[in-house]
Amino acid sequence: MIIHSSSSNSKKEYTMADDFITTIDSDDEVSNYGEPSALPKIKDDELDPDFQFDLGGGRSEGLDLWGGDEVQGVKKGNEPINVDDIIERKRGKPIRAFKDRKRKRDEDATSEDDLEEDEEEEGDSNDDSDAAKSGDSEEDEMDVDMSEGDGDEEDENEIESLKREDESDEEEEEEEDDYDEEGENEVVDSDSESEEETAAEIARKDAFFSSDPTTTDPTLPSSFTAMNLSRPLLRALTSLQFTAPTPIQARAIPLALLGRDILGSAVTGSGKTAAFMVPILERLCYRDRGKGGAACRVLVLCPTRELAVQCEAVGKALAEKGGLDVRFALLVGGLSLNAQAHTLRTLPDILIATPGRLIDHLTNTPSFTLSALDVLVIDEADRMLEAGFTDELEEIIKACPRSRQTMLFSATMTDSVDELVKLSLDKPIRVFVDPKRNTARGLTQEFVRIRSDDSRSPSLLALCKRTIREKCIIFFRSKALAHQMRIVFGLFGLKAAELHGNLTQEQRLQALNDFKAGTVDYLLATDLASRGLDIKGVETVINYDMPGQLAQYTHRVGRTARAGRKGRSVSLVGEADRKMLKAAIKQAEADQVRHRIIPSEAVTAMKEKLEEFKDDIQEILKEEKEEKLLRQADMEIKKGQNMVEHEAEIFSRPARTWFQSGKEKQASKSAGKDAYVGSFPSTGKSAEKEKEKLKRGKYDGLSRRLKRRKMAIEEDAADAAAARKTEMGIRAAKKNALPKKITEPQPRLEKAGKGKDKKKGKARRVTGGKGSAFDSEGKKSHEGMRAKPAKVNLEKGKKKGGKGKGRK
């Protein structure tokens, strides 16, 4: 096809394709592809051969808690003291995590293999004589390598321990066995000791609780789409890989959407947080969005700050993935009060708080109330009902409206009417999923018998050095013991972090993030970390000592084997822990209980090494204490400077108030601590000492002569006390016989045989006049003796004049 194009300059003919359409009388477009240009050439992007389409529709790898930006927004203070720096100075070597040590060993082994291959190639290319010489040199190099390996004792021991790791595991697996028949008989005997509910208690519970309609409903929802949830929320659940609801979610979510009060209980790691967060977000999708509709509608109470941070992360993940316009506010200690008060002025939809900080804002933050609250959720409700939280919880309940919906969740939820009646529930429904089981199915519980408390720490170190090398949480009874064991772990070359109440909020969150990221292998914690925390990848939980309550043991071992995964718990059991051991075995299945035996040689070796580090531990603790005192002094100096420079501003601020007095607050705190400490069993030594004190008499162990002498001394002392008592009685009688006041008359002594004066016992009534200076009793009696009124005749002896008398 030939197209003629006309222009003012010239005519040209172009051969074009059949489907080409042009404009008539258009200007010629001359393109010179071969001429260079001053502009840089833009290369077309090449296709990536490894490109793959995302068939998941924007799905993530699931809800991954911790390891993110939890530390951001925490109130920054002075830089905390890093104990690892002090330990590294003592050791002379840095403390590395297990994966870093393993990576270094793999790199060293790879470099050695490459070196050997190069030497073999050179040996093959040479002559026979040269090969012989090279063989001698190789032997010399091997000798040098061996000598160098002997120089670094730590690396050699680590390599040998890695080689023996499989062997030791096999030996320990052979030593693991079920408990004997005697232990099973003891467990059976404990069944008869357990208290049974009386008929009156059952009747009270039937009247207090409402029946659960989901227990008899065979058509429980097997997917989230069957729950009539909104599309944004379904999209969020799908993107977070929540494919099917767990049993607690399938039963609790439909009831929560109906606005019923719920008591939810299920095993640890079964998704209880999503069970109350999903219906909350669904209800907030249909809230009033008008100008006057903004209000704080949901309150989630948590016993610890870390659990509150985790609940906020779950709620924010669901809201962001679903594109929901829901705002959260985190009210916990350790964060800035002013920032939280500013957030509360914007009226966020969901408040996630700890009780103390919430009451602080209710008392001191202007215009903040809970009058518009629709839903109240108490996570780990059994802990919130214990001593230490009861007063604060009652104060929060008073601030909430009666028409609210209340949901309580815990793995060890109680159904005691006496405790739940404080929360003003409205016909609550018990949603207890598998109440006979409190531990996960994938959990294997192992118990190690400890003969004496002196072998407890060496047994723990032997266990960590031989078998359990990473992703392990170790629970301790006290904060001081957890800190001391962190120093011991550092001296043994084990990378550990601590988590307890003596740390700042920044240190606590940083420890959780480091443990999640694998920077540290062991998390040494108190019961602060036993409830609710969901840390992905925890393989083992070790109980350094058994807790005082079975519920606390359940929450401790529940940090592993979560969401259908496998896990194991190892508990060091002493003689004082036999009762708790029976209870733990009773609630577990027979195939989940194992008896682990740690070789005595390993425990003895660790005990000897621990004795060598005893002085180093004391020096590190002393150095840390001195550093803390220096920082405290600097802080006091800085505080004084601020008081001088900003005195007017500081004193102009309104004082923060509390709903309790100082004594009441301290009493509440002491009650919680006493309840926690009192639940632990007493050690064997202290119990024996108490028995000795009760049995030992005051004459036990004395000879016959000393016994008589002691008895005579006691008799003389008793006689002297009686004589002194008699003398004191005589002195008191003489003192009472004296007049009470100098100006008062002495009482008359009655003669024998005369009758008693009837008016003697009557007190004379004195009125008027001011009190005497000597009147200490304030009776206002007159001074001196007062005579009776009488007429005085001044003309004695004279005759009175009268009418007609005396006149002559």
Swiss-Prot record:
Residues 208-223 have a biased composition (Low complexity). A motif (DEAD box) lies at residues 379-382. A motif (Q motif) lies at residues 222-250. Residues 442-621 form the Helicase C-terminal domain. It holds the Pfam family Helicase_C. Residues 109-129, 137-159, 167-199 have a biased composition (Acidic residues). Residues 27-46, 64-223, 661-808 are annotated as: Disordered. Residues 686-703, 741-755, 776-786 have a biased composition (Basic and acidic residues). Residues 90-104, 756-767, 797-808 have a biased composition (Basic residues). Residues 575-645 form a coiled coil. It is found in: Nucleus, Nucleolus. InterPro entries: DEAD/DEAH_box_helicase_dom, DEAD_box_RNA_helicase, Helicase_ATP-bd, Helicase_C-like, P-loop_NTPase, RNA-helicase_DEAD-box_CS, RNA_helicase_DEAD_Q_motif. GO terms for cellular component: cytosol; nucleolus; preribosome, large subunit precursor. Its EC number is 3.6.4.13. Gene3D superfamilies: P-loop containing nucleotide triphosphate hydrolases. One of its GO terms (molecular function) is RNA binding. ATP-binding RNA helicase involved in ribosome assembly. The Q motif is unique to and characteristic of the DEAD box family of RNA helicases and controls ATP binding and hydrolysis. Belongs to the DEAD box helicase family. DDX27/DRS1 subfamily. This is ATP-dependent RNA helicase DRS1. It comes from Cryptococcus neoformans var. neoformans serotype D (strain B-3501A). The gene is DRS1.
